[in-house]
């Protein structure tokens, strides 16, 4: 396990830096940030992605299942002298807004959809649109399942944390190796849940179509923009030809960015 997964302040700062240098620029042609802009992040963790939006004067809200992460988000924002509303709840069961003023101009969903298991994915996607304003935008980013560390094995403490593609092994063998590596049972269960989720580019785009979203922009990254913070590597897009080959492209896409709107 890398130190950043244990030092949550460092983790928060790195997410904020990537959001500041990459996500806001990615959104600029489609969204002007003002003090009236309402931003919701689903699966916000400690809130690092939201910090630059709060710095720009936006009204930000974060939702997360993990109560500890919500407490940390509140602490980090308070330390930064910024306002943000953070709520510990399950988004799928969250009450839908009833007025346009309660809805959001931007919904961020970053490194979340790969954690949602198959039976719940469609419900999750369908539940997003009621939270979005008529001209609002959704920004979703996720690592393709078959990429070298698409199983999130880097969160492990033992030898498996450094082995690429190990998550693609059959489940019984993968489970045995996780146990041999000395991983905690709760971590093993989390990794097996991600394996059951197995979010590919193709499945994601199918979900978008079936739940009523229109694609505005799509970028497949060979080197994830966040790797600049983690490993000092410059972001690189996946070559266009490679990005057009279904299934095969998942092995090379360390992050996929999508901007979506609701079909009206």
Question: Language-model features: where?
Answer:
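S-adenosyl-L-methionine-dependent methyltransferase catalytic module, highlighting the catalytic core
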Residues: 120-128, 137-258
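Active-site beta-strand termini and strand-to-loop segments that position acidic
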Residues: 260-263
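Conserved N-terminal segment of class I S-adenosyl-L-methionine
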Residues: 1-102, 106, 122, 253-257
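Surface-exposed loop/turn positions
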Residues: 37, 135-136
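Active-site micro-motifs of SAM-dependent methyltransferase domains
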Residues: 93, 114, 147
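A short beta-strand submotif of the Rossmann-like class I SAM-dependent methyltransferase core
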Residues: 109-112
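Helix-to-beta-strand junctions that scaffold the AdoMet/dcAdoMet cofactor pocket
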Residues: 117, 132-133
């Amino acid at each position: 396990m890398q130190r950043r997964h244990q030092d949550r302040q460092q983790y928060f700062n790195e997410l904020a830096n990537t959001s500041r240098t990459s996500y806001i620029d990615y959104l600029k042609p489609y969204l002007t940030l003002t003090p009236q802009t309402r931003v919701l992040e689903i699966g916000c963790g400690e809130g690092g992605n939201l910090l630059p939006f709060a710095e720009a004067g936006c009204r930000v809200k974060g939702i997360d299942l993990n109560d500890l992460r919500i407490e940390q988000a509140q602490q980090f924002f308070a330390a930064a002298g910024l306002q943000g509303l953070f709520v510990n709840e399950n988004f799928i069961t969250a009450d839908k807004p009833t007025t346009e003023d309660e809805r959001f101009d931007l919904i961020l969903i970053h490194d979340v959809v790969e954690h949602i298991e198959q039976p719940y994915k469609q419900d999750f996607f369908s539940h997003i649109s009621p939270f979005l304003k008529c001209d609002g935008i959704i920004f979703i980013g996720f690592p393709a399942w078959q990429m070298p560390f698409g199983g999130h094995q880097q969160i492990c403490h033992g030898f498996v944390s450094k082995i690429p593609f190990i998550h693609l092994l059959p489940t019984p063998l993968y489970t045995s190796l996780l146990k041999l590596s000395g991983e905690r049972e709760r971590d093993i269960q989390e990794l097996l849940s991600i394996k059951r989720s197995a979010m590919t580019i193709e499945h994601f785009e199918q979900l978008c179509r079936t739940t009523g979203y229109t694609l505005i922009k799509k970028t497949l990254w060979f080197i994830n923009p966040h790797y600049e913070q983690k490993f000092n590597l410059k972001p690189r897009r996946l070559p266009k030809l490679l990005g057009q080959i279904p299934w095969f492209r998942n092995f090379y896409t360390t992050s996929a960015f999508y901007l979506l709107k609701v079909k009206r």
